[in-house]
UniProtKB/Swiss-Prot annotation:
Principal subcellular localization: cytoplasm
Subcellular locations according to the entry: Cytoplasm
Source organism (scientific name): Bacillus cytotoxicus (strain DSM 22905 / CIP 110041 / 391-98 / NVH 391-98)
Protein name: Ribosomal protein L11 methyltransferase
Known catalytic reactions: L-lysyl-[protein] + 3 S-adenosyl-L-methionine = N(6),N(6),N(6)-trimethyl-L-lysyl-[protein] + 3 S-adenosyl-L-homocysteine + 3 H(+)
Designated gene of the protein: prmA
Keyword Methyltransferase appears in the UniProt entry: yes
Length: 312
């Protein structure tokens, strides 16, 4: 069977949004070629567990590759992708050139091609994220492993925003805490919260593909006794109180529910948000404060921020 490899040249800012669009369109695998991976700050602090080949990365911008079966509707799919990506600037998301190219690949080639971009990565003092097909031995008894299968949705959990959310969870989750993960994606943040001692984690996503992916990864990590996954739009209809809410979403989506977060998280509880480019930090902080939160800490990595806020 022949497959089409669709490559989109975009920006780091647009990676999560474009990846989501591709998964929504039915991509069977997504690979991200980001040259920032070659020099990023966390590489110096924690050390990558694998070697990267600069020749496989673009000179500038980010290239996102997605794999689709060749069908009669492929051109219609590509046109729909282009339309969805072209809308992103209206949400203040810079897409760069947005150029789309197409290559034909054999099934045996695509089935392994995208996996070369995913390897074990230590993202904090506590956690290492390991793709399911990689063998990995923890370097110490205290190291916690999160196994992820990125084939279905939302990558391997090593984007700066995810990394910062996990580090924020390390700082804040206490044994016995109740947690809600809004926009769970792969389920990585819910799994991390469970492994940090949370007693109950509710993971929600509007996308049924994300729900399926999160359920699979939760089972894979043997945290299904703590984490429940469901389909839901943000915090609509969700009752509290809980100790902590975490949401790694686009800034524009975070702005839609600070008041709901204040309603659901208990007094003195925490709201961790990321997916926020540095230029929008002030806007998000002001919205959180208006809803009754106090900004306790801001984490920064590359051009992204994560905010830890406390409900007054």
């Amino acid at each position: 069977m022949k497959w089409s490899e669709i490559s989109i040249h975009t920006t780091e800012e647009a990676v999560e949004a474009v990846s989501h669009i591709l998964h929504e369109a039915g991509a069977s695998g997504v690979a991200i070629e980001d040259p920032a991976e070659l020099t990023k700050e966390r590489e110096q602090q924690y050390g990558e567990i694998y070697a990267l080949n600069p020749a496989e990365y673009p000179a500038d911008g980010v290239v996102i590759k997605a794999y689709f079966p060749q069908t009669d509707s492929l051109q219609e799919t590509i046109a729909s992708l282009k339309s969805s990506i072209d809308v992103l600037p209206s949400y203040d998301i810079e897409i760069g050139t947005g150029n789309i190219t197409i290559n034909e690949v054999d099934e045996e080639d695509w089935a392994t091609a995208w996996k070369k971009y995913y390897h074990p990565v230590q993202i904090s003092d506590t956690f290492t994220i390991v793709p399911t097909w990689e063998e990995y031995t923890p370097s110490s008894p205290d190291e916690k492993i999160i196994e992820l299968d990125p084939g279905m949705a939302f990558g391997t959990g090593t984007h700066p925003t995810t990394t910062m959310c996990i580090r924020a969870l390390e700082k804040t989750v206490k044994p016995g805490d109740t947690v809600i993960d809004v926009g769970t994606g792969s389920g990585v943040l819910s799994i991390a919260a469970a492994k940090l001692g949370a007693a109950s984690v509710q993971a929600y996503d509007l996308d049924p593909v994300a729900v399926e992916s999160a359920e699979m990864n939760v089972r894979l990590n043997k945290t299904d006794d703590v984490v429940s996954v469901g389909q839901n739009s943000l915090l609509e209809g969700i009752e509290g109180p809980v100790d902590l809410i975490v949401a790694n979403l686009l800034a524009e989506i975070i702005l839609m529910f600070p008041e709901d977060a204040a309603r659901v998280v208990k007094q003195g509880g925490l709201f961790i948000t990321s997916g926020i480019i540095a230029a929008k930090e002030k806007t998000i902080s002001e919205a959180l404060e208006k809803a009754g939160f106090t900004i306790k800490e801001v984490l920064r990595m590359e051009d992204w921020v994560a905010i830890i806020a406390q409900n007054a």
